[in-house]
């Protein structure tokens, strides 16, 4: 899953640390989210979207092909 977290942080002039504190996670979690190495829980995705006054789907871009991809 791709994210636009970094883009939204820049728009709001917010550091990874500030966002992490606002949503109750460690900065490393934000790093992993931005790199696409971690998929957030629905609750975390919602919290992040609320910080930026946006919809979840504005921040998290889900590739539907990933859903059907065999692992």
From Swiss-Prot:
InterPro entries reported for this sequence: Cro/C1-type_HTH, Lambda_DNA-bd_dom_sf
**SMART domains per the UniProt record, alphabetical:** HTH_XRE
List the lineage, top down.
Archaea, Methanobacteriati, Methanobacteriota, Archaeoglobi, Archaeoglobales
Q: DNA-binding residues per UniProt?
A: 16-35
**Domain called HTH cro/C1-type: residue spans:** 5-59
- This chain's source organism reads Archaeoglobus fulgidus (strain ATCC 49558 / DSM 4304 / JCM 9628 / NBRC 100126 / VC-16)
Which keywords does UniProt give here?
DNA-binding, Transcription, Transcription regulation
What's the protein called, per UniProt? Uncharacterized HTH-type transcriptional regulator AF_1627
MF (Gene Ontology): DNA binding
The family database entries (SUPFAM superfamilies) matched by this protein are listed as: lambda repressor-like DNA-binding domains
Gene3D superfamilies given in the database record: lambda repressor-like DNA-binding domains
């Amino acid at each position: 899953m791709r994210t636009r977290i970094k883009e939204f942080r820049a728009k709001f002039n917010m550091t990874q640390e500030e966002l992490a504190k606002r949503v109750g996670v460690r900065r490393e979690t934000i790093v992993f989210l931005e790199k696409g190495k971690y998929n957030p829980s629905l609750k975390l995705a919602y919290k992040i979207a609320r910080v930026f006054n946006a919809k979840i789907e504005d921040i998290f871009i889900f590739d539907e092909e990933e859903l059907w991809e065999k692992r």
